[in-house]
Curated annotation (Swiss-Prot):
Disulfide bonds: none annotated. The lineage of its organism: Bacteria, Bacillati, Bacillota, Bacilli, Bacillales. Substrate binds at residue 148. It is an enzyme of class 1 (oxidoreductase). The gene is yjdA. This is Uncharacterized oxidoreductase YjdA. The keyword Oxidoreductase applies. Belongs to the short-chain dehydrogenases/reductases (SDR) family. The active site is at 161 (proton acceptor).
């Protein structure tokens, strides 16, 4: 990605102080990248405060509250970012829907809810990004999706989540081939279990012994990997599912 090219990043799912999306916004802003983030079910006062925090880093920042389960969300988001900041050269699909279900509880409603956010929204954001990128004067771009290690082992009790996240890996690999001629790299990151807003003390105590490095991953760990993939140095990396989870031991 050319250093003379103004960089604008679109990040979905930055909805609370301690989540991965928020850490990604901070990391990219610290590198001089303008930020557009989406959120949902967030405290309005916190969103405004966080936006001001990013602005104090010397970059532009816009936020948008949107329900990604809406079939028109991808188009709406790209229209808004183009109007407010310009064409993004970086897309990070961080938002996800997750609800526990097993063979007893899984139903059409749960499948549809997971599909709408984890697959449809993600995929449409990617292709809308690429279509607009092709019409722009941007030289190279980055798409970074998020997976959950479903390639490395089973996730019992998370059937819809595991299936829809697994689809992201397949989509990432295929899309990378299509977009390579445009100068867009497409990768996915599995950050492993991350000590963010979802993790309770019970879960934390259960997972801690499974990390040989002596600690659970943090949102900043994920943000550093994503920032690297969004950088100029990662221009030769595409079609990869990167497991950045501190040697996490499954089973």
């Amino acid at each position: 990605m050319s250093h003379s090219q103004e960089k604008i990043a679109l990040i979905t799912g930055a909805s609370s102080q301690g989540d991965i999306g928020t850490a990604i916004c901070r990391k990219l802003a610290s590198q001089g990248i303008h930020i557009f983030f989406t959120h949902w079910n967030s405290d309005t006062a916190w969103i405004e405060e966080f936006q001001q925090e990013i602005l104090r880093m010397g970059v532009r920042c816009e936020a948008m509250k949107i329900d990604l389960s809406d079939a028109h969300a991808a188009f709406t988001i790209h229209e808004k970012i183009s109007d407010k900041l310009g064409y993004p050269s970086i897309l990070i699909n961080n938002a996800a829907h997750s609800a526990s279900d097993n063979y007893v509880s899984l139903d059409a409603k749960s499948l549809d809810e997971h599909y709408a956010v984890n697959m449809r929204s993600n995929f449409l954001l990617c292709v809308e990004f690429a279509r607009r990128f092709k019409k722009s004067n941007l030289i190279s771009g980055r798409i970074i999706n998020m997976t959950s290690g479903q390639d490395l082992g089973p996730l019992p009790g998370e059937l819809a989540y595991a299936a829809t996240k697994g689809a992201i890996s397949a989509f990432t690999r295929s899309l990378s081939q299509e977009l390579a001629p445009l100068g867009i790299t497409v990768n996915a990151v599995n950050p492993g279990p991350t000590d963010s807003t979802w993790m309770t003390d019970e879960i934390r105590n259960f997972l801690s012994p499974k990390f040989p490095m002596g600690r659970i991953g943090t949102p900043d760990d994920a943000a550093r990997m994503i920032a690297f993939l969004a950088s100029d140095e990662a221009e030769w990396i595409t079609g990869q599912i990167i497991h950045s989870e501190g040697g996490f031991i499954r089973g």
